């Protein structure tokens, strides 16, 4: 049946609203991915490899909760607000509260087993339950806001900008607030960090509510109960394994997260430990954010002309080569290091600006391939990959920090500092290059095929509404 309800057209309000959604996401996600390891190694005195193991265990839990939430979204009935938006308002409070609970420095005097158990429980609740229950609907909502490829690219860009603004707060402002000077060294203050975590949680709730208020779901394609029953979880997973576009973008995104989060996590060690200057970490974020801003300006016109996957190959290869240069040159001047990292962030920024539009391309491709639209399920699998990338990074970083002998008592020894620099440059270099190769040789949705798929689905959906 044709829907006669007048829906306001896609506009700037949707872009801003969607931007606030990722701002809210990253107020807890980036705080965790960038500082949780540092908080537990330096404040709670838990070995890095243990923190990494807990994060990796949580990702196995996500294998079930992410997919389950995706199916819940696909089976949700359409409401006046849409199918995905209600979850954002419903779950913004719980995710913010549990995020705050993860950073309780007052518990640092507990026995180590108790601290490990506390981290495990709160991290599972935050990431595998509450963050999943808000992030899956939020990501799935992009394809429901508009079916126009240019609109979706705009949403992808504004989503990344929201993450950038959150990143500016997390990576630039937080380091200025959480360190004290002790014996000439920059040492993290647990009490200050707990307060900062509370402020980040409050900001997350505000941003989520703005996202809910400003966006509109327009594409109301919904699978019937019979289709969902026929295409059950087993069939969905079987189709996913055969979906070259989905699997390749999942693997590519894992390497993207490894490169990005390694740089972010290791910044907490490179600047205060290797360069002996935690203040530069905050200033460096401003410069690196400049690289992302330039990427935001040029990504959309370049993607429209050459294709999203095509420009991502070039940008990630540039970032990989620069990271290798850093590893071999090993600049002793911190500002030379920051200048070269600027180029890495520019390369990463181009891919970050288009990656969410790539996911909507994959959702379209899956609908054509399988005959059913499953925004929630496809996005859930991708979200699981992102969390897996986060866990692999934390596990890898934690293991490598333990391998080089990093502890609270050895944090400023010469050999340990050299190991910190190795991790911060070589791991991203390898990941950037592998990401570029995957997009070029494995990922099938280049510009020509994407344009054909969009036109096919537009005709299909218009015919269905008649």
Q: Can you describe what each PLM-predicted range is?
A:
Residues 2-466:
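Membrane-embedded alpha-helical bundles of multi-pass transporters/translocases
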């Amino acid at each position: 049946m044709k829907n006669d309800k007048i829906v306001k057209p896609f506009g700037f309000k949707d872009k801003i609203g969607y931007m606030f959604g990722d701002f809210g996401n990253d107020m807890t996600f980036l705080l965790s991915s960038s500082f949780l390891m540092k908080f537990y190694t330096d404040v709670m005195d838990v070995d890095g490899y243990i923190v990494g193991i807990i994060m990796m265990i949580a990702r196995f839990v996500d294998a079930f909760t992410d997919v389950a939430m995706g199916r819940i979204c696909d089976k949700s009935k359409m409401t006046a607000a849409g199918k995905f938006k209600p979850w954002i308002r419903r779950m913004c409070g719980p995710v913010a509260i549990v995020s705050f609970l993860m950073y309780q420095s007052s518990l640092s005097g507990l026995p180590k087993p108790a601290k490990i158990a506390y981290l495990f429980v709160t991290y599972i609740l935050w990431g595998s339950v509450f963050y999943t229950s808000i992030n899956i609907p939020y990501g799935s909502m992009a394809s429901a806001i508009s079916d126009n490829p240019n609109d979706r690219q705009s949403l992808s860009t504004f989503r990344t900008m929201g993450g950038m603004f959150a990143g500016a707060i997390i990576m630039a402002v937080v380091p200025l607030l959480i360190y004290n000077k002790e014996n000439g060294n920059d040492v993290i203050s647990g009490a200050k960090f707990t307060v900062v975590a509370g402020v980040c949680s409050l900001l997350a709730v505000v941003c989520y509510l703005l996202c809910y208020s400003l966006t509109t779901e327009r594409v109301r394609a919904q699978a019937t109960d019979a289709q969902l029953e026929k295409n059950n979880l087993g069939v969905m997973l079987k189709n996913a394994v055969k979906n070259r576009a989905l699997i390749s973008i999942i693997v590519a995104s894992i390497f993207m997260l490894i490169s990005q989060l390694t740089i972010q996590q290791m910044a907490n060690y490179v600047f205060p430990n290797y360069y002996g200057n935690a203040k530069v970490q905050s200033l460096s974020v401003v410069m690196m954010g400049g690289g992302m801003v330039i990427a935001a300006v040029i990504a959309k016109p370049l993607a429209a002309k050459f294709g999203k996957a095509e420009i991502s190959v070039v940008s990630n290869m540039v970032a990989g080569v620069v990271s290798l240069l850093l590893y071999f040159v090993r600049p002793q001047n911190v500002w030379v290091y920051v200048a070269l990292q600027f180029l890495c962030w520019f390369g990463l920024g181009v891919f970050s600006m288009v990656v969410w539009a790539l996911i909507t391309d994959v959702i379209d491709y899956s609908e054509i391939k399988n005959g059913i639209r499953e925004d929630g399920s496809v996005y859930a699998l991708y979200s699981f990959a992102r969390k897996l990338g986060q866990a692999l990074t934390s596990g890898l970083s934690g293991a490598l920090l333990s391998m080089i002998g990093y502890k609270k008592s050895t944090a400023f020894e010469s050999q340990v500092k050299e190991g910190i620099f190795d991790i911060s440059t070589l791991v991203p270099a390898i990941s950037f290059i592998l990401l570029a190769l995957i997009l070029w040789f494995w990922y099938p949705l280049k510009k020509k095929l994407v344009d054909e798929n969009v036109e096919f689905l537009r005709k299909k959906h218009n015919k269905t509404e008649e």
